[in-house]
Amino acid sequence: IYHKIVNLNTGEVSPFPYPENTNLTYVSPFSEDNDKIHIIRSGWTTASTYSYADLAQPSLPEKKLGFRKEFNYPFAENITSKEVFVKGHDGVEIPVSIVYRKDLELNSKNTVLVYGYGAYGYSTSAFYSPILLNLVEKGAVFVVAHVRGGGEKGEDWHMAGFKQTKPNTWKDLNSTAQWLIDNEYTSP
């Protein structure tokens, strides 16, 4: 949701049409004399995928490169993820990633693991972890609060959780926990 393509010749900016809840871990030119690029991506439920795409194509179709065997979590089809925005203590919207079983019941009885890191402008992007997927498969909910101090929304977001504004970082985490309670993911 944060990726854009910038044409350096024209300055034109367009969205990078990629599956939601995936992280582009690497993008580089396929060769200097065409518009193709190498792409490595992963997601909350998808191991790293190596592929290439042609920037000249409007839909940017992805072609998988078969030189690496893909390993996916065996029960990944039972797990999904979504991105929500949680209103912070001061009204600012905090991006939050939620990874959960597709058959999750919102009954306030779920075990929830909340992770948040907001410092040095570091962004916590979607990453693949069979260990966390195993926890989710057993019924837990994994939540990443992209709190201020991190880099998810640029330098202003980083500075909004730095030095004098550092309390925003843990207040964002508290707001996320309260949202999870209010929306019956879990209880205190």
Predicted features along the sequence, with ranges:
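Short flexible coil/turn linkers enriched for glycine and charged/polar residues
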Residues: 10, 33, 44-45, 90-93
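Cytosolic C-terminal regulatory domains/tails of membrane transporters and channels
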Residues: 34-36, 51-54
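Cap/lid segment of the alpha/beta-hydrolase catalytic domain
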Residues: 67-188
